[in-house]
């Protein structure tokens, strides 16, 4: 069945900002889809609000709209494309995660698809609803002879109580049409039930929840399937969760293929999966289905399905080499599986199911340290912010590799022995077993500790519900440790066995201290000729030859085993080190820069080699770089890749400046080991990080910086703070994403900080800086080739200094800076770039106060804002930086047209659009152990997971779009609640007067209301929670927010403890109900401008391709 001839113009709906539960995997799937559809000669239009994605690059589609993924904007795109003579005839919504599916359902319900005669391809509305609606899906499972957990769909709390009476506690609560388990949970008590089911009803767009019998402790599996228009179905991959049911699959360590299924169980699941995909009606494309197996009696239950490409699809795709998203796009336009060739072999059709001759392990990356007070129990609501994948010849080797890929404090078993075995816990087996009953991030380390304290597999299974097979694998590792420890000498056979089990040199050194650390183990290993061989992912267990070089390392027991790395060409090679797992502070933006470097260097004649371990990203797609290594980003693993590449050709150098802090942290050791680092040198990177050297540079260049001092103890910190004056900003040195940073207003808070934060880093001191209150913060991206500096973009933060730049909204071009300010920025940036010795990208943060431009920090690397600046100005910064690294000058790039002539990012043409970047925060995912919300205040510590961009001709419209994209659509009428700290009251009067004149009802607390009334603003006084607690009659503001009576909240934090508690409750209830919340004075002003733009109805849509012409005209 060839391609359909009635499809000419496809709208691909992207997934929007990175949030927990929906991350970079959808950029990867959407990018593949856009490429395929364009290759097939179709016109492609894309909507996605996230600028940090490859899919929103102008080359990926004919028209790219960086707009909020909402029906009104999609309808504007339909209208605009008709006006331009290119009507859209089909929409592909199965590759943009839950966001795209929910948008498609709304388009259908509002009649927009019918109005414009547009068809949904991949999965129609009925199939989406049958897969996503809990009751419909349950009926389908029954139809095909499968079994679901006993459950009922409830629309209100009365129905919930009735169901629980029948099923008994505990129960699982799951809302419909949400992703990443948002709003779901386990209810053990009636209090739990009220909290979780109430929240679940609020989280579900359909206002219904499924209450299900608890199948906690069962084994959980997933099957990834594809179906074409001829009803051919293939099963691509089985995935098994190491954690038992009760931990969200996104938070569990998972393994592919499934390890503990019997053949009979696998066949039952396979048959049911195929019957379900047919019955649901996913006509074309991928889906994943989750099953549970009762370990006691083998009863199999179908849990749920995603009728779309999902997080698991990205994992299955990278694990097998089978390009699921690419095929889903081909099948959606009419091809069948037997008509599409598998890219990796070049000869087999996609109808051949992949076979694996290796084991894949995925491990989640968490960020609980960013949310003090959050409950770190792993439940059915997903909490991890990223993940890694590793490939090995056996399960334990793949697991060891995955754990060290995570880049947490503990790089695998035994690598943090001092901290880990501190205190009584190290010897108290019962305490460890008790801890294992509550799943947390470190549970595998707890299992290993319990084994060394003598726990049996039966005891551990009882405590953790982890299948005995996985426990036995870990027991073999613990037994091997004893053998390794007790051997009188570490000979070749024993060292080979250790490496075969996936142990790193660092882990071996921890057990054999006489080898003098990791370097000593490496020297011994090399002297014995023990190196990894590199195997190939080929989808067919070596039955056919692979055409795409996609490698992983393995140590074989046989010394004669051969590597499969063959030189592709005679070209010089450049290694690009990726950014590892997504985490807060280091996300998809860095992957974006790595991908651009790979594509650009390939284009100009280099052979590009990507090293990364993140399965969600475009950088680990098999056709992004010329060669891909799926390896941990540790010194040992990178050195072995470099050695293998050097053996098969000439390596021009390694690029470390694009992947964030991860590769930067390796730069010095790599250079010392003889690896050529191209671009900015490790010495220059260190100079920018070292406060003393950097301070000297500022002195020489006569650039002002806030006064600062360094301290190794509380006494020293107190002396520094007294000298430079409070408030001060305190932080450890060498951090990304503002880890452990705080603004401190007095000595007591300083002492509290030092006690909490000095454990962050023993060898690095704490830095104490003068904090510039109420300054304007400015973010700058620039390129430097060693001689010339190009100012790429000047962004003005909307929040004042003190909010981490990754969490602050910002505008480009800047809104309140004059020509003189920008000239100061340009000259200061030039002095810094040349003084540091930057070759490539640099990011500088400034604060402007009383007409003095202070340098806050300079980072000689690709920044978080590089993709945003690239989209807003039409200049591909990462491509330019990669060319500078291999010797091009800015003049060369100007001559090629990559960098504009006649202006820079500080002097954009007058008709250039205004771009606003807004951060997306994950507070709805985290709760305190008692179930209360976390405080949502912004601080110098970064908390956002992703970002969106708003583009328009004026600031108000751009800001309004950015807020809509970040899930905080501003209201155009209704009720506004105002409660601001005393120091902010004068600053907000004008903004509130404008809201009053637009007809909003104003609610205010007593103190704020008095000030508003004195300024002629009519408002209603509302009670604070503390008033009601003290016995005042009436409903508090928190009650009114929870009852849906408030449309916008303006609340800046106050100083006293009582006021702080009231503010915390107000902000927490805003997150629970989903009311837009503004917590800074500048944010209030911006919000009012946004509301005015919305009321004027000025929101138009323009494709990036048109804007590029406007910027470059």
From Swiss-Prot:
Q: Please tell me which top-level EC class this enzyme sits in.
A: ligase
Q: Where does Mn(2+) 3 bind?
A: 845, 857
Q: Which cofactor does it need?
A: Mg(2+); Mn(2+)
Q: Where is this region: Carbamoyl phosphate synthetic domain?
A: 566-967
User: Quick one: which residues bind Mn(2+) 1?
Assistant: 290, 304
Q: How is the cofactor bound?
A: Binds 4 Mg(2+) or Mn(2+) ions per subunit.
**What SMART domains does the database record attribute to this sequence?**
CPSase_L_D3, MGS
Region (Allosteric domain) location: 968-1113
Q: Which InterPro entries match?
A: ATP-grasp, ATP_grasp_subdomain_1, CarbamoylP_synth_lsu, CarbamoylP_synth_lsu_oligo, CarbamoylP_synth_lsu_oligo_sf, CbamoylP_synth_lsu-like_ATP-bd, CbamoylP_synth_lsu_CPSase_dom, MGS-like_dom
Which pathway does it take part in?
A: Amino-acid biosynthesis; L-arginine biosynthesis; carbamoyl phosphate from bicarbonate: step 1/1; Pyrimidine metabolism; UMP biosynthesis via de novo pathway; (S)-dihydroorotate from bicarbonate: step 1/3
Q: Which reaction does it catalyse?
A: hydrogencarbonate + L-glutamine + 2 ATP + H2O = carbamoyl phosphate + L-glutamate + 2 ADP + phosphate + 2 H(+)
Annotated spans, Oligomerization domain? 408-565
Please report the stretch or stretches of sequence annotated as the ATP-grasp domain: 138-333, 695-886
For this protein, what is the EC number? 6.3.4.16, 6.3.5.5
Task: Report the record's Gene Ontology biological process terms.
Answer: 'de novo' UMP biosynthetic process; glutamine metabolic process; L-arginine biosynthetic process
Q: Where is this region: Carboxyphosphate synthetic domain?
A: 1-407
Output the Gene Ontology cellular-component terms.
Answer: cytoplasm
Q: Which residues bind Mg(2+) 2?
A: 304, 306
Keyword annotations: Amino-acid biosynthesis, Arginine biosynthesis, ATP-binding, Ligase, Magnesium, Manganese, Metal-binding, Nucleotide-binding, Pyrimidine biosynthesis, Repeat
Where in this chain does the record put each MGS-like domain?
968-1113
| Domain remark in the UniProt entry | The large subunit is composed of 2 ATP-grasp domains that are involved in binding the 2 ATP molecules needed for carbamoyl phosphate synthesis. The N-terminal ATP-grasp domain (referred to as the carboxyphosphate synthetic component) catalyzes the ATP-dependent phosphorylation of hydrogencarbonate to carboxyphosphate and the subsequent nucleophilic attack by ammonia to form a carbamate intermediate.
| PANTHER family on file | CARBAMOYL-PHOSPHATE SYNTHASE [AMMONIA], MITOCHONDRIAL, CARBAMOYLTRANSFERASE FAMILY MEMBER
Among HAMAP family, the record links this protein to: CPSase_L_chain_B (MF_01210_B)
This protein is called what?
Carbamoyl phosphate synthase large chain
- The organism of origin for this protein: Corynebacterium efficiens (strain DSM 44549 / YS-314 / AJ 12310 / JCM 11189 / NBRC 100395)
